[in-house]
Amino acid sequence: MIKPIVKDILFLGQKSEEATKNDMVVIDDLIDTLRANLEHCVGLAANMIGVKKRILVFTVGNLIVPMINPVILKKEKPYETEESCLSLIGFRKTKRYETIEVTYLDRNFNKKKQVFNGFTAQIIQHEMDHFEGIII
């Protein structure tokens, strides 16, 4: 189900909790909401649709990839960039890493470990910041 994007900074500033199998419907809601916003958005964290759980989705080409309880294990090659967010107006400066290694659960709760580079790595870092209440 397509959900409205949360813009309440006080809500978005709160930390998210670990997701469980009971939160599976959130993945479908995130995917539906991202599809509805693809013109302006490449990723979403669950708190952006009002759910304080550690779930995110992002685009890779035509695919939408969900990540449950992701953790960055390694990060390399820091750089400065500017980002925008559906929850905010305009662009903000931030620090990101060119390469990250992430462990996460897929939508079937299978554990995965993967290396991401470039813009995909940037999207994942941005969405994971939401879990910590960090809004670029």
From Swiss-Prot:
Q: Which InterPro entries match?
A: Peptide_deformylase (IPR023635), Peptide_deformylase_sf (IPR036821)
Q: Which GO terms describe its biological process?
A: co-translational protein modification; translation
Say if the entry is tagged with keyword Hydrolase.
yes
Catalytic activity of the protein: N-terminal N-formyl-L-methionyl-[peptide] + H2O = N-terminal L-methionyl-[peptide] + formate
* EC number, as in UniProt: 3.5.1.88
Cite a single Pfam family from the UniProt record: Pep_deformylase
User: Matching HAMAP family, A to Z?
Assistant: Pep_deformylase
Q: Which family does it belong to?
A: Belongs to the polypeptide deformylase family.
In Swiss-Prot or TrEMBL terms, this protein is called Peptide deformylase
Can you name the source organism?
Answer: Clostridium beijerinckii (strain ATCC 51743 / NCIMB 8052)
Q: Its encoding gene is what?
A: def
